[in-house]
Amino acid sequence: MGAVILDGRAVAADILAELTERVGRLRGQGVLPGLGTVLVGDDPASHAYVAGKHRDCAKVGIASIERTLPASASQAEVAAVIDELNADPACTGYIVQLPLPAGLDEVAVLERMDPAKDADGLHPVNLGRLVLMRPGPLPCTPRGCLELLRRYEVPIAGADVVVIGRGITVGRALGLLLTRRSENATVTTCHTGTKDLAAHVRRADIVVAAAGVPGLVTPDIVKPGAAVLDVGITRVIGDDGRARYTGDVHPDVREVAGWLAPMPGGVGPMTRAMLLANVVEAAERQAGFPAAS
């Protein structure tokens, strides 16, 4: 019997339907949420990802505000766009598509954002609020992982969780989320300096692979019945010479795990859904609506 597939596409569709209703209530009060995107450069993957975000906006009734700059844009030019969106009342929240082209200071750009308009939850102020367990926009991918586990009723309280990867967008932030009292998991963060990764993974009830190493998590190191979430994505060249994207989890893990969020179709759609959730929640806060349960 194989793993239960954690279908991020299906869950994300449910979330978008829920958000559509909430946006309708906001519109009834004269509030139109708006998502801004700042895209610098001509990376095809970034352009495709941003286009997907705006398609999602159209589905739920959120206005789109697009700002695109060439790869040659200076730090000052990017800063000017940030200042514009900070001041624009039509922009409820916005994201800066990362990575930025070489030569631009990503941290300086993120720090310049209005924390209240940080739709990605990556502003230093909002990450600090997460550390302090205070309300605020949450990083989208970690929030998507957590919501996917909840919707499939995967036990989290008291679970031993291994997160492979210590990047701020997934690994470190996810550990902070899962150790809140509302989740009460015990989290081990593994990385390139971890000795005997397999030993850590074997005892985990939940494994989140976000290292960017294809096939890193193999069936022999997964506890039978564990939940495994594949967040890794790496561009590789196949035997046929064509490029494709692959995750961190070996396909055969589905024969051992109890639950599996595959790549693609698992966490990715949830990340986009959580971005819109952050925008809608920001609009509700601004309108004085009670916090959603």
UniProtKB/Swiss-Prot annotation:
GO terms for biological process: L-histidine biosynthetic process; methionine biosynthetic process; purine nucleotide biosynthetic process; tetrahydrofolate interconversion. One of its GO terms (cellular component) is cytosol. Its EC number is 1.5.1.5, 3.5.4.9. It catalyses: (6R)-5,10-methylene-5,6,7,8-tetrahydrofolate + NADP(+) = (6R)-5,10-methenyltetrahydrofolate + NADPH; (6R)-5,10-methenyltetrahydrofolate + H2O = (6R)-10-formyltetrahydrofolate + H(+). Transmembrane segments: none annotated. One of its GO terms (molecular function) is methylenetetrahydrofolate dehydrogenase (NADP+) activity. NADP(+) binds at residues 165-167, 192, 233. Pathway: One-carbon metabolism; tetrahydrofolate interconversion. CDD domains: NAD_bind_m-THF_DH_Cyclohyd. Keywords: Amino-acid biosynthesis, Histidine biosynthesis, Hydrolase, Methionine biosynthesis, Multifunctional enzyme, NADP, One-carbon metabolism, Oxidoreductase, Purine biosynthesis. Catalyzes the oxidation of 5,10-methylenetetrahydrofolate to 5,10-methenyltetrahydrofolate and then the hydrolysis of 5,10-methenyltetrahydrofolate to 10-formyltetrahydrofolate. HAMAP family: THF_DHG_CYH. Homodimer. Belongs to the tetrahydrofolate dehydrogenase/cyclohydrolase family. This is Bifunctional protein FolD. It comes from Acidothermus cellulolyticus (strain ATCC 43068 / DSM 8971 / 11B). The gene is folD.
